[in-house]
Amino acid sequence: MEDFDALFAVNVRTPFFLVQRLMPIMCRGSSIVLVSSPAAHAALGTLSAYAATKGAIDTLVKHFAAALGERGIRVNAVAPGVVPTDMSSFAKTADGRDFALGIQALKRMAQPDDIGAVVAFLASDDARWITGDTVRVDGGSKL
């Protein structure tokens, strides 16, 4: 129960209330980029609570985009695939790496810059006509 509540506190409550607080002070043309996960759209056994939090983010993105669109504020999310960081320590093991590579079309592990480049794009004026969307940045996993 504690882990479940902690996941929702970090992954849903925090971005929800942060965006709520920022809404009144955001300028026209601003952009919000939240973090989702491909896990929101896959049945991955023990990750059901985590997946539910990321599904909630995908829904919040749509609601926030609708609420802020009149003010010219865009809201999107990225859904990163497996990046070998402390958050996905399993990917640092041979079995975890084999699993991650096995589900990706591009057959390499993502690096933080792979994800950061998409976040930068979504936050930029180059993405001025994109809102309410979650962009998968996962190397083509589960194609």
Where are these predicted regions, by residue range?
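Short C-terminal tail/terminal secondary-structure segment
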Residues: A42, A120, T131-L143
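Active-site helix of classical SDR
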Residues: V19, T53
